[in-house]
């Protein structure tokens, strides 16, 4: 019998998550029925959205999330033993599936690319960057793009796609190490928002003419400052609001309606699951090719050990990571 370890939400978050919010449980999995497979987690993802999505869980539920898993036993001919899949299986070491919701890695996945990239640059974060920039912002060559949390899993891909499309890219991050990384990736301007005397002045210096596109991962006062510097007909893709996720008090006021009206700005929130089928497959192929060709670079922040899932999650929310946070089971 296989023992499955699962991290559950012991208590709903109040403010910043702590170890006491999580509980590790062990259950014995039953034998497989016909049509089922037994999966073993290889790599698991922790992402900012989980902080918000956990509100919908009941206490005692498994934490949600994607993982790269291997089929270790199969009674389903579509998924023979050894098949590598990506699926929303949550924070669990082993699971049983009837095959629904399991996505095989593309047959053309290059041997030189780590499997964990299917949770990062060639997975949900990469797709988020791709569609947010190209569809929501409707990016055009020659425009100026601003992205915050730019050294993270999504932001780092946003900046590199924008450069591929012939744009000027300004990125902000929360440490000098991250700023150096952004410059290595080819960002035109990058600065540490925590150490500049004035965010408003730093943004204006980076692009005196303002910004055509703003890819927002942070929200809050940061975004209120940016919106004042958007060009007429500017577009804003609202991907996340990590500055607000752990607040216990009221949120700060939003941006000035007058600015949005008279600058004729377009703001749109989005969730990447909107794009499915052929468009999603094309995006994954584009991302995979760009990475294989060295046009998009990546960095993974890997924590070893399934037992460290909560620590990796909390570290990611604090900004400890450079690039995509991954747990190797």
From Swiss-Prot:
Reactions the enzyme catalyzes: 13,14-dihydro-15-oxo-prostaglandin E1 + NADP(+) = 15-oxoprostaglandin E1 + NADPH + H(+); 13,14-dihydro-15-oxo-prostaglandin E2 + NADP(+) = 15-oxoprostaglandin E2 + NADPH + H(+); 13,14-dihydro-15-oxo-prostaglandin F1alpha + NADP(+) = 15-oxoprostaglandin F1alpha + NADPH + H(+); 13,14-dihydro-15-oxo-PGF2alpha + NADP(+) = 15-oxoprostaglandin F2alpha + NADPH + H(+)
Any Pfam family hit: ADH_zinc_N
Main location as per UniProt: cytoplasm
Ligand binding (NADP(+)): 152-155, 178, 193, 217, 239-245, 270-272, 321
EC number: 1.3.1.48, 1.3.1.74
Keywords carried by this UniProt record: Acetylation, Cytoplasm, Fatty acid metabolism, Hydroxylation, Lipid metabolism, NADP, Oxidoreductase, Phosphoprotein, Prostaglandin metabolism
In-chain residues carrying the UniProt-annotated modification Phosphoserine: 20
Compartment list: Cytoplasm
Gene Ontology, cellular component aspect: cytoplasm; cytosol; nucleus
UniProt record, GO biological process: alkene metabolic process; leukotriene B4 metabolic process; lipoxin A4 metabolic process; negative regulation of positive chemotaxis; negative regulation of reactive oxygen species biosynthetic process; prostaglandin metabolic process; response to antineoplastic agent
SMART domains cross-referenced by the UniProt entry: PKS_ER (SM00829)
Kinase in keyword set: no
Modified residue annotations for N6-acetyllysine: 178
Cytoplasm found in the keyword field: yes
Modification type N6-(2-hydroxyisobutyryl)lysine: residues: 178
GO function terms (MF aspect): 13-lipoxin reductase activity; 15-oxoprostaglandin 13-oxidase [NAD(P)+] activity; 2-alkenal reductase (NADPH) activity; leukotriene B4 12-hydroxy dehydrogenase activity
Subunit structure: Monomer or homodimer.
Physiological role: NAD(P)H-dependent oxidoreductase involved in metabolic inactivation of pro- and anti-inflammatory eicosanoids: prostaglandins (PG), leukotrienes (LT) and lipoxins (LX). Catalyzes with high efficiency the reduction of the 13,14 double bond of 15-oxoPGs, including 15-oxo-PGE1, 15-oxo-PGE2, 15-oxo-PGF1-alpha and 15-oxo-PGF2-alpha. Catalyzes with lower efficiency the oxidation of the hydroxyl group at C12 of LTB4 and its derivatives, converting them into biologically less active 12-oxo-LTB4 metabolites.
Protein name, entry field: Prostaglandin reductase 1
Protein species of origin: Rattus norvegicus (Rat)
Gene label: Ptgr1
């Amino acid at each position: 019998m296989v023992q499955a370890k699962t991290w559950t939400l012991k208590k709903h978050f109040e403010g910043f998550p702590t170890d006491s919010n999580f509980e590790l449980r062990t259950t014995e999995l039953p034998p497989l029925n016909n049509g089922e497979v037994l999966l073993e987690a290889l790599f698991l993802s922790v992402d900012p959205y989980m902080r918000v999505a956990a509100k919908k869980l009941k206490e005692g539920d498994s934490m949600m999330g994607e993982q790269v898993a291997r089929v270790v036993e199969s009674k389903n001919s579509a998924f023979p033993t050894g098949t590598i899949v990506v699926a929303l299986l949550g924070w669990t070491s082993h699971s049983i599936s009837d095959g629904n919701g399991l996505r095989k890695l593309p047959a053309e996945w290059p041997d030189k690319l780590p499997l964990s990239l299917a949770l990062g640059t060639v997975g949900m974060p990469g797709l988020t960057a791709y569609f947010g920039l190209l569809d929501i912002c409707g990016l055009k060559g020659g425009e100026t793009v601003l992205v915050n949390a730019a050294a993270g899993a999504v932001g780092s891909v946003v900046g590199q796609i924008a450069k591929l499309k012939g744009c000027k890219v300004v990125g902000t991050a929360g440490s000098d190490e991250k700023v150096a990384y952004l410059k290595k990736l080819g960002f035109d301007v990058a600065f540490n928002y925590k150490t500049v005397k004035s965010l408003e002045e730093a943004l204006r210096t980076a692009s005196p003419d303002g910004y055509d596109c703003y890819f927002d991962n942070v929200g809050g006062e940061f975004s209120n400052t940016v919106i004042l510097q958007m060009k007429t007909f500017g577009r804003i893709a609202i991907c996340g609001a990590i500055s607000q996720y752990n607040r216990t008090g009221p949120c700060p006021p939003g941006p000035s309606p007058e600015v949005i009206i008279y600058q004729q700005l377009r703001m749109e929130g989005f969730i990447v699951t909107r794009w499915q089928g052929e468009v999603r497959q094309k995006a994954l192929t584009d991302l995979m090719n760009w990475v294989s060709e060295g046009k998009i670079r990546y960095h993974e922040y890997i924590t070893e050990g399934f037992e460290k899932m909560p620590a990796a999650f909390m570290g990611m929310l604090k900004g400890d990571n450079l690039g995509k946070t991954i747990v190797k089971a």
